[in-house]
């Protein structure tokens, strides 16, 4: 029986074999590597991955799809909302210090998923995700550009990222109304040590009114914390590079 894509899960299934091959080449799976796929759907990407890996763990929320996937002898199925999955526990279950994570992420919750994985980054070797191209543009954006924001700062602090493949809407069934792309995310080996909640709060405050100078937003936040250091608040949030936000978070941690 044909599976009808569910709008509430943001389901758009990959159907272009050329694009699927290109994604698998970008991921470059090796036999025996511990890998987790988020949102395997109809297994378009799952099958070529598991053929190369030998075994694959998948996270699927849709009950009907999870039941189908369980019939595959080489898949370990976690039927769950990915935002509730403890990836440290998954790595432990796979007896792996670090796991590779891949997926065609549901576009309606892609940012929460990225932040959830950020909290588990210590057990992640790398990530390859299909996302809305506009989201990837924000992830890799440079300072002083309109795409640069909270997502750019939080992810660039912890990952080296690159857009590795453009994916047009007609590669999916049903086609989304947006362009897509594949991003590669490799955690930095020696990231700057800081309190992630402090960086998150600091960046959220800074970009809360991005048109205003930081003295109206972040300046007040720093005053409330009795910050005694120096930081130029006569700038807009988008003008401050990641390294300066990180240094400020370290001083406030």
Swiss-Prot record:
SUPFAM superfamilies the record matches: S-adenosyl-L-methionine-dependent methyltransferases (SSF53335)
Phosphoprotein recorded as keyword: no
GO CC term, one of those recorded: cytosol
Location(s), subcellular: Cytoplasm
Gene Ontology molecular functions: 16S rRNA (adenine(1518)-N(6)/adenine(1519)-N(6))-dimethyltransferase activity; RNA binding
Keywords per UniProt: Cytoplasm, Methyltransferase, RNA-binding, rRNA processing, S-adenosyl-L-methionine, Transferase
PROSITE patterns: RRNA_A_DIMETH, SAM_RNA_A_N6_MT
The EC number(s) this enzyme carries: 2.1.1.182
Keyword Transmembrane helix assigned: no
Listed SMART domains: rADc
Function summary: Specifically dimethylates two adjacent adenosines (A1518 and A1519) in the loop of a conserved hairpin near the 3'-end of 16S rRNA in the 30S particle. May play a critical role in biogenesis of 30S subunits.
Classification via HAMAP family: 16SrRNA_methyltr_A
Matching PANTHER family: DIMETHYLADENOSINE TRANSFERASE, DIMETHYLADENOSINE TRANSFERASE-RELATED
Family: Belongs to the class I-like SAM-binding methyltransferase superfamily. rRNA adenine N(6)-methyltransferase family. RsmA subfamily.
Designated name of the protein: Ribosomal RNA small subunit methyltransferase A
């Amino acid at each position: 029986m044909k599976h009808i894509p569910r709008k509430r899960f943001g389901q758009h299934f990959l159907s272009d074999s050329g694009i699927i091959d290109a994604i698998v080449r970008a991921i470059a799976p090796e036999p025996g590597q511990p890998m987790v796929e988020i949102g395997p759907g109809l297994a378009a990407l799952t099958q070529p991955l598991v053929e190369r890996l030998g075994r694959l763990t998948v996270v699927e929320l849709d009950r009907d799809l999870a039941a189908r996937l369980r019939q595959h002898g080489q898949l370990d199925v976690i039927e769950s909302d990915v935002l509730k999955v403890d990836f440290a526990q998954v790595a432990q279950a796979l007896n792996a210090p670090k796991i590779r994570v891949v997926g065609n992420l549901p576009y309606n919750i892609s940012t929460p998923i990225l932040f959830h994985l950020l909290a588990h980054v210590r057990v992640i070797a790398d990530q390859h995700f299909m996302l809305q191209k506009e989201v990837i543009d924000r992830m890799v954006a440079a300072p002083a550009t309109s795409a640069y924001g909270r997502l750019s700062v939080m992810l660039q602090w912890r990952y080296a990222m690159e857009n590795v493949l453009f994916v047009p809407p007609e590669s999916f069934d049903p086609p989304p109304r947006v362009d897509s792309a594949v991003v590669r995310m490799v955690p930095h080996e020696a990231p700057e040590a800081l309190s992630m909640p402090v960086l998150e709060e600091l960046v959220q405050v800074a970009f809360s009114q991005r048109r205003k100078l930081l003295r109206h937003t972040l300046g007040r936040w720093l005053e409330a914390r009795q910050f005694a250091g120096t930081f130029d608040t006569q700038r807009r949030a988008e003008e401050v590079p990641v390294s300066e936000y990180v240094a400020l978070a370290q001083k406030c941690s």
